[in-house]
Amino acid sequence: MLQISHLYADYGGKPVLEDINLTLESGELLVVLGPSGCGKTTLLNLIAGFVPYQHGSIQLAGKRIEGPGAERGVVFQNEGLLPWRNVQDNVAFGLQLAGIEKMQRLEIAHQMLKKVGLEGAEKRYIWQLSGGQRQRVGIARALAANPQLLLLDEPFGALDAFTRDQMQTLLLKLWQETGKQVLLITHDIEEAVFMATELVLLSPGPGRVLERLPLNFARRFVAGESSRSIKSDPQFIAMREYVLSRVFEQREAFS
């Protein structure tokens, strides 16, 4: 379980996050949404251990987070892939740093690429891939170390609508298959409502938890209902419009 208690963070002396309290149970998919400047990415970087926090605590499985660790896999919007390495070697890179024997890490990379639908692309280079394929590589790399927690920072924001829909459904299928804790940062309201088992709305200036919404649309998808059916459901549309109104309220209040 991920547990965040009374978390405060600032940047250059300016408060960015204030009194954040969140929990993420095993097998849940938590989505964090809010207007620009609410500290979404800062929160992910704190959980990843990339930057320090000033007060409070972040714990994963009862252990305080004080820096990066293999128990947390991270996927970024810009992928962060190495262009001079082929797809397989990109996925295996973290395993290489961890000292995993070559044949074992290449087999793990092969299995992860199979999971994300890139079997047969092992020897291709990053420049030969589409945006969606590059994000699949990024997800495969993050999963290769078998982390407890998968962190994704607006991973589909730069993709076209069709590819974004494909990646959303892929991530939900992987979430179901692996049973991992997943925390997704997004600015896309429809994506947030569709993918979350719990949706956290942050307010800006500094970021605070405005509202927490338990949702079941992701579970309906992994149970077999199509994404198109879910997104056209009046319940889904009503929730999407409610969340949109809350985000607009916050943006107007702090503009």
Swiss-Prot record:
Enzyme Commission designation: 7.6.2.7
GO molecular function, one term: ATP binding
Amino acids binding ATP: 34-41
Ranges in coiled-coil conformation: none
Record's GO cellular component terms: plasma membrane
Compartmental location: Cell inner membrane
Main location: membrane
Catalysed reactions, as listed in the record: taurine(out) + ATP + H2O = taurine(in) + ADP + phosphate + H(+)
Membrane topology reported for the UniProt record: Peripheral membrane protein
Residues of the ABC transporter domain: 2-229
CDD domains noted in UniProt: ABC_NrtD_SsuB_transporters (cd03293)
EC class of the enzyme, as a word: translocase
Alphabetic keyword roster: ATP-binding, Cell inner membrane, Cell membrane, Membrane, Nucleotide-binding, Translocase, Transport
InterPro entries attached to this UniProt entry: AAA+_ATPase (IPR003593), ABC_transporter-like_ATP-bd (IPR003439), ABC_transporter-like_CS (IPR017871), ABC_transporter_ATP-bind (IPR050166), P-loop_NTPase (IPR027417)
SMART domains: AAA (SM00382)
Subunit structure: The complex is composed of two ATP-binding proteins (TauB), two transmembrane proteins (TauC) and a solute-binding protein (TauA).
Role: Part of the ABC transporter complex TauABC involved in taurine import. Responsible for energy coupling to the transport system.
NCBIfam families linked: PRK11248.1 (NF008421)
Family: Belongs to the ABC transporter superfamily. Taurine importer (TC 3.A.1.17.1) family.
Protein name in UniProt: Taurine import ATP-binding protein TauB
